[in-house]
Amino acid sequence: MKLPEIFASPANVRTVLQGTPIFSKGDESGEMYVVQSGEVDIVLNGKIVETVGPEGFFGEISLIEDSLRSADAVARSDCKLLPVNRHHFLFMVDEMPQFALHVMKGMADRLRRADKRAEG
């Protein structure tokens, strides 16, 4: 499943320049992002904990939990992002179970990488 193809719409693409914050820890959230091109760093307590590249996504946790942002997201390079709002996200989960599985797999992969980093 290629998320950029599902959510791509020229009117929907958000261009973000290198070094630009996308959101900050503690911000209210209303959308997740799919990376169409470029890279985004996820930063927690001043440390890069994940770099998300093309076809990856970030910001989904706050949509699922309806919570504040848990980390900062900063454009590592110039990038094109596809925002997915809560309404569209929930619609996709209802209508395309494989989308929900894709998101869960991405979250599980991220958790596994975090566990490996914590182990040393």
Language-model-detected regions and their locations in the chain:
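Cytosolic regulatory regions built on CNB/CRP/Popeye-like sensor folds
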Residues: 1-120
